[in-house]
Amino acid sequence: VMGRHAYHHALGTHRAELDEIWSRRDDISWHNPAGFWVGRETLYAYYADAKAKQDEATLKLMAKFNPNIEVKPENFQMGALMMHSLTTPLIEIADDGKTAQAMWYSLGQVTNAGPDGTATGVWMHERYAVDFIKEDDGWKIWHFFVGNDLGCEAGKPYAEYIPQEPAGE
């Protein structure tokens, strides 16, 4: 399941991810340093639709400077590269076999191209804590927590990184 999450996240196909590997329950949740979202419609709005709008805006900006770039959904990830590897899995299935809890460490990066052809990149060292629930068609993500240990611009020394307060504090 988490391998499919990493795949969808890298492609930016968050709507397909929500449809395929997340629980059908109404109380699914996603937490990252920017905030906490609960409910299927809320996750569609934040995790899927907002990402697509961001990708479209970036693509429109790039197309202004390069008329060969077509602004269409198939190109929304153009100029972006996301990768979040999954390491050190720790998975425990409840005695009743209906739920599971798991943790991973993720070393990732996000790179975005600017309209002028330059790129910016960010390194991310994160912890994932995920609750799974077993449904008729297999294990599904129920709750997903992303904790950021370190995130800094690529090319800058880690020692210059200044930690930010978590959202809401």
At which residue positions do the language-model features occur?
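Short beta-strand edge/turn micro-motifs at domain boundaries
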Residues: T99-M103, H125-A159
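Short, cysteine-centered beta-strand-loop-beta hairpins and adjacent loop/turn segments enriched
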Residues: G108-V122, G151-C152
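Short, aromatic-enriched amphipathic alpha-helices that serve as compact interaction elements
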Residues: V1-L11
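A solvent-exposed, acidic/Ser-Thr-rich amphipathic alpha-helical stretch
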Residues: R15-Y105
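Short beta-strand segments enriched in hydrophobic/aromatic residues
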Residues: H9, W22, S106-G108, F145-N148
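Non-globular disordered terminal and juxtamembrane segments underlying protein topogenesis/assembly
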Residues: F144, P166-E169
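Flexible, surface-exposed loop regions and adjacent strand-edge segments
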Residues: T118, E160-I162
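Short, surface-exposed coil-to-beta transition loops
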Residues: H84-L86, V122-Y128
